[in-house]
């Protein structure tokens, strides 16, 4: 049995030194991912440290949920791989939650700036902010094609005429952009 396996068993039994060992063992990974969020998501300078604390809490939860009875986990490589992938998933969840928090704060500030009677305007502005955020992962051409296609209800032939290119090229750009958007959502 590896030292990591023994410490995970001790950690699941509440041993503080084992928890400390596991945190130290994966500290490099945690430090890497605490900095991996987009700058737009950070609200202040303390967010990076908050990210680290959230990842440490996730690590402890992950370790406590490892099915240690499974003989596969006696192999240290399997344990490290399991923890690594679980931390990646936790990071993705944190990213989604921080985006939701950011949208909520932005919408609250918009709502406070616009009077109550202008609710449709607030919803229109909020949806435009969300669309612009989603399109940031695309190239300029991909953004244009998606905006023409879905926001302006243009056909691919019309977009090709506007951009001075072929319909097939527009279709290819649209499909590439949609794949990127699916991956980022």
Curated annotation (Swiss-Prot):
User: What are the protein's UniProt keywords?
Assistant: Antibiotic, Antimicrobial, Bacteriocin, Plasmid
One GO molecular function term? DNA-binding transcription factor activity
What does its record list under induction?
By UV irradiation.
* InterPro entries named among the record's database cross-references: HTH_dom_conjug_TS-like, RNA_pol_sigma-70_dom, RNA_pol_sigma70_r4, RNA_pol_sigma_r2, RNA_pol_sigma_r3/r4-like
Record's superkingdom?
Bacteria
Q: Would you kindly state one Gene Ontology biological process term found in this protein's UniProt entry?
A: defense response to bacterium
Pfam families xrefs: HTH_16 (PF12645), Sigma70_r4 (PF04545)
**Main function:** May have a role in bacteriocin secretion or immunity.
Name of this protein = Bacteriocin UviA
- Protein encoded by which gene: uviA
